[in-house]
């Protein structure tokens, strides 16, 4: 299990893995019917935010990887290869009907790097689509927040 908090004892935000947890078992929103597609996110909040932006569509699996480990932006990125995520490997083993992977990582260096790595690793066996947020540096949570603020503003203007 992945732990994330606003503040630690020093007043800084923190992220950590719960001791003894198993990355194979990750947050997943199943489709209401049958589906051959899985959308893959860095975090569960991204999956829920993207689902909100898609008006609650339940036509695909939405799987969180519980974070990604990317190299720092710079020279090292060309040589480092990403390990296949345990959560996605286990999911695909358990769902052989899945033929399409939609990569919905963040649109920052780490997310773009992970998207390219995962596409390369899975495109021989699956149809792989990169679906990053259109805004540079954003994740789907940022876009959902923007959409909510826009909706509030429009409602306020109509109420005048």
Stretches with model-predicted labels:
Residues 1-94:
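Phosphate-handling DNA/RNA-contact segment within nucleic-acid enzymes
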């Amino acid at each position: 299990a992945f732990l994330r908090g606003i503040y630690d004892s020093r007043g800084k935000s923190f992220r950590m893995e719960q001791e003894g947890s198993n990355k194979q078992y990750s947050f997943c929103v199943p489709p209401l019917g049958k589906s051959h597609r899985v959308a893959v996110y860095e975090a569960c909040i991204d999956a829920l935010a993207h689902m909100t932006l898609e008006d609650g569509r339940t036509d695909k699996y939405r799987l969180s990887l519980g974070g990604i480990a990317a190299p720092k932006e710079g020279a090292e990125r060309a040589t480092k290869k990403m390990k296949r995520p345990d959560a996605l490997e286990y999911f695909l083993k358990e769902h052989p009907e899945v033929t399409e992977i939609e990569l919905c990582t963040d649109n920052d260096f780490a997310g773009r790097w992970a998207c390219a790595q995962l596409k390369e690793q899975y495109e021989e066996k699956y149809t792989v689509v990169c679906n990053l947020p259109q805004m540079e540096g954003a994740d789907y949570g940022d876009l959902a927040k923007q959409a909510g603020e826009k909706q509030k503003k429009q409602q306020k203007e109509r109420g005048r």
